[in-house]
Amino acid sequence: MPYLLISTQIRMEVGPTVVGDEHSDPELMQHLGASKRSVLGNNFSEYYVNDPPRIVLDKLERRGFRVLSMTGVGQTLVWCLHKE
């Protein structure tokens, strides 16, 4: 799985940061210290960490991921990363 999306609600100085969904690499989610949750009303699960995005991006960079793009959608910030 070379692509990864992470997101956070505005304020990006604090967590939580969403780092994956139910199809994400379990080993990578464990490395990030992510917990799996299901939000009431959603029919899917997501992995999140309490770290701010900067900490998550630093951890992912050390694992070989690079940011391809970043955007804001409403009050959500999203980063797309890729690993060669």
Swiss-Prot record:
InterPro entries: GFRP_sf, GTP_CycHdrlase_I_reg
Any matching Pfam family: GFRP
Superkingdom in the source lineage: Eukaryota
Places the protein is found: Nucleus; Nucleus membrane; Cytoplasm, Cytosol
GO biological process: negative regulation of biosynthetic process
Cited Gene3D superfamilies: GTP cyclohydrolase I feedback regulatory protein GFRP (3.30.1410.10)
Alphabetized UniProt keyword annotations: Cytoplasm, Membrane, Nucleus
Gene Ontology MF terms in the entry: GTP cyclohydrolase binding
Keyword hit for Transit peptide: no
CC per GO annotation: cytoplasm; cytosol; nuclear membrane; nucleus
Family listed: Belongs to the GFRP family.
Function: Mediates tetrahydrobiopterin inhibition of GTP cyclohydrolase 1. This inhibition is reversed by L-phenylalanine.
Subunit-level organization: Homopentamer. Forms a complex with GCH1 where a GCH1 homodecamer is sandwiched by two GFRP homopentamers. Interacts with GCH1.
Official protein name in the record: GTP cyclohydrolase 1 feedback regulatory protein
Lineage: Eukaryota, Metazoa, Chordata, Craniata, Vertebrata
